[in-house]
A protein has these predicted regions:
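Short loop/turn motifs that connect adjacent beta-strands in outer-membrane beta-barrel proteins
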Residues: 26-27, 43-51, 93-103, 117, ...
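Outer membrane beta-barrel transmembrane domains
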Residues: 29-30, 67, 214-310
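Cleavable N-terminal export/targeting peptides
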Residues: 1-32
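Residues on the lipid-exposed face of transmembrane beta-strands in outer-membrane beta-barrel proteins
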Residues: 42, 56, 87-91, 141-147, ...
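Residues that define the transmembrane beta-barrel architecture of outer-membrane proteins
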Residues: 50, 79-87, 133-140, 178-184, ...
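Transmembrane beta-barrel strands of outer-membrane/channel proteins
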Residues: 31-34, 54-62, 104-110, 158-164, ...
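Surface-exposed strand-loop-strand hairpins of Gram-negative outer-membrane beta-barrel proteins
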Residues: 27-33, 60-84, 119-131, 174
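Outer-membrane pore/translocation modules
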Residues: 100-103, 109-218, 259-261, 276
Length: 310
């Protein structure tokens, strides 16, 4: 059976992972909610504590190419950099619902965004735009978390996340931290840690989007599978993580003749460090490269997370 320290490390991750939120709406070629949030310990929630658990996530995403529906560079002069700083609060209780512990949480994020786009036709620049800003993104409310521990080394939880259109938004700006629409996301997370310390973790999420009233654009339903495989070695967990993102439904907007369905795969190294008796927060770090993008940007992301229960 995994040691209590291993399970505690996995549990604290869950709130650190919450400290992330949206990038752009799919109408701008990016997913509605953040990708690459979960890796090790996705299925474990923190213990019940007097004051709850807090987490922080800092991520940097960079892309210099937009892929078309065939996976080819669309030829535009494009560059985007998004630095996200997210704070999360999670409170698990001893109340039981459907045989699980009940909990709730919330996430608030700020984005520093720097984007440039140039379009050439006939050897001449016909369009150019840029934006640089540091503004709040949409708030995520998590009114329902259910946490099960069905067997030693096994953690399963389900969550309902509601993303409210509270972030800064301007339909005439190249990029915006906010999406200007509501999103409801059912989530299922699971982890298994073997007696030898081998970990398998997965997170499955659907994003169901409302219509953007400013543009009359409704993004299709989005699916995300985030995963990690790693080995626990003392205070470290070393392995591989990533995510698979795919838009399941067509976008809907006036004059839109194609569904604009996006997809992408990301892979890269992931590592975590935690000493249960040290009093230090748990730390997770991963670096992912995106592949096989369709109808969206393709780039790189690095994310650092910390979490602690009080």
């Amino acid at each position: 059976m995994p040691s209590p320290g291993v399970l505690t490390r996995a549990a604290v991750l869950s709130v650190a992972a919450l400290a992330a939120t949206i990038t752009h709406a799919t109408e701008k070629g990016m997913p509605t909610t953040a990708a690459g949030v979960q890796d090790f310990g996705a299925g474990f929630m923190p213990p019940t504590t007097p004051f709850g658990t807090v987490g922080m996530r800092i991520s940097d995403y960079q892309a210099r190419v937009i892929k078309d529906s065939h996976g080819k560079d669309n030829g535009n002069d494009f560059n985007i950099n998004v630095l996200a700083i997210g704070l999360a609060y999670l409170r698990m209780t001893d109340q039981q619902l459907l045989g699980a512990r009940y909990g709730f949480g919330a996430v608030s994020v700020f984005f520093r965004m720097d984007a440039d786009l140039g379009i050439d036709a006939g050897g001449q620049r016909v369009f150019s735009d840029s934006a640089e800003l540091f503004r709040p993104a949409d708030v995520q409310l998590i009114p329902l978390i259910l946490d099960w521990r069905p067997a030693p080394g096994v953690g399963i939880n389900t969550q309902l996340s509601i993303q409210a259109p509270t972030g800064d938004y301007d339909k005439d700006r190249l990029v915006s931290p906010g999406t200007n629409h509501w999103t409801v996301s059912p989530i299922l997370n699971a982890s298994y840690i073997s007696p030898s310390g081998l970990e398998l973790s997965s997170s499955f999420q659907l994003d169901i989007n409302a219509r953007n009233a400013a543009t009359d654009y409704r993004s299709g339903v989005e699916y995300r599978h985030e995963f990690a495989v790693g080995q626990h070695v003392g205070d470290w967990t070393l392995g591989l993580g990533g995510y698979y993102y795919r838009q399941l439904g067509d976008d809907d907007a006036p004059g839109l003749t194609r569904g604009n369905r996006a997809r992408v795969l990301a892979l890269g190294p992931a590592v975590s460090f935690f000493q249960p008796t040290s009093g230090l927060p748990a730390i997770w770090l991963h670096a992912y490269k995106e592949f096989e993008a369709r109808n969206r940007a393709e780039g790189y992301t690095v994310a650092l997370r910390i979490g602690a229960s009080f």
